[in-house]
Amino acid sequence: MTSTINKHLDGEGSVQVKQDPKVNIEEGALVIAVYGKGGIGKSTTSSNLSAAFSKLGKKVLQIGCDPKHDSTFTLTHKMVPTVIDILEEVDFHSEELRPTDFMFEGFNGVMCVESGGPPAGTGCGGYVTGQTVKLLKEHHLLEDTDVVIFDVLGDVVCGGFAAPLQHANYCLIVTANDFDSIFAMNRIVSAIKAKAKNYKVRLGGVVANRSKDTDQIDKFNDRTGLKTMAHFKDVDAIRRSRLKKCTIFEMEPTEDVIEVQNEYLSLAKNMLENVEPLEGTPLKDREIFDLLGFD
């Protein structure tokens, strides 16, 4: 007895969208996309980096690109409504919205937006990122922005992965000094290299996070042509700042806190003045497996 299996196109029945090439962020703004293994500290890094840019006198917009919508709460001190939720309330008639419905001011004037995402298993994260940028442009909210930071979910290398890369100048990859994080970073490098053929985005460098040492990261950088732009050790004040729902710049200025603050300020300054586009050559899975570890 034979059975007939109906085959469907990948994504059929899901919320899908093609990115509109006309929906771009104005030239002049520095646009950074932050990637990395899930749970590595991208939102912490993004929020503190946004705060650092604001400390340098820049007008900053942070866009959280994760259905968990927890990218900006240390800036706003609360969980803000997502763009997709707000659009659903008005049946996707964006002309009915006001900027205050979906954009919120956080620490030191940093403007915050959470794109949100479709229900699990029903679509692509790139859809809501594209809709978010479109909405911001419709309301002329990007015209006076100096820095835009996209905080992107996990290390998913799919169609939605390309949405922030359509707009970004540079990509920062957050990693720890361990195999899993660096393995994920290698996959992200591969994806960015592929997308860079069509978009202006380039690799900006590596952020070593929650790591006392960087020996494994250094090995990877030496082989692939990447560069560590900042190193944040496993400082308990960073963990406590998340629990306090604030940035590291709002914590009591202990020696450890001041060191972290200065590292973020240095990273922000380098991204503005001293960043060099990196080519980056990803390794094959077997090569990275053999590279990392102790001799």
Swiss-Prot record:
Positions bound to ATP: G39, I40, G41, K42, S43, T44, K68, N209, R210
A Pfam family it matches: Fer4_NifH
Keyword tags: 4Fe-4S, ATP-binding, Chlorophyll biosynthesis, Iron, Iron-sulfur, Magnesium, Metal-binding, Nucleotide-binding, Oxidoreductase, Photosynthesis
Cofactor field: [4Fe-4S] cluster
Name of encoding gene: chlL
Catalysed reactions, semicolon-separated: chlorophyllide a + oxidized 2[4Fe-4S]-[ferredoxin] + 2 ADP + 2 phosphate = protochlorophyllide a + reduced 2[4Fe-4S]-[ferredoxin] + 2 ATP + 2 H2O
Record note on quaternary structure: Homodimer. Protochlorophyllide reductase is composed of three subunits; ChlL, ChlN and ChlB.
Family: Belongs to the NifH/BchL/ChlL family.
UniProt cross-references to InterPro entries, sorted A to Z: NifH/chlL_CS (IPR030655), NifH/frxC (IPR000392), P-loop_NTPase (IPR027417), Protochlorophyllide_ATP-bd (IPR005971)
Coiled coil segments of this chain: none
GO molecular function: 4 iron, 4 sulfur cluster binding; ATP binding; metal ion binding; oxidoreductase activity, acting on iron-sulfur proteins as donors; oxidoreductase activity, acting on the CH-CH group of donors, iron-sulfur protein as acceptor
EC number: 1.3.7.7
Reported function: Component of the dark-operative protochlorophyllide reductase (DPOR) that uses Mg-ATP and reduced ferredoxin to reduce ring D of protochlorophyllide (Pchlide) to form chlorophyllide a (Chlide). This reaction is light-independent. The L component serves as a unique electron donor to the NB-component of the complex, and binds Mg-ATP.
Pathway note: Porphyrin-containing compound metabolism; chlorophyll biosynthesis (light-independent)
SUPFAM superfamilies cross-referenced by the UniProt entry: P-loop containing nucleoside triphosphate hydrolases
Tagged with keyword Hydrolase: no
Positions bound to Mg(2+): S43
Enzyme class (EC, first level): oxidoreductase
Organism in which the protein naturally occurs: Prochlorococcus marinus (strain MIT 9515)
Protein name: Light-independent protochlorophyllide reductase iron-sulfur ATP-binding protein
Gene Ontology biological-process annotations: light-independent chlorophyll biosynthetic process; photosynthesis, dark reaction
Disulfide bridge partners, by residue number: none
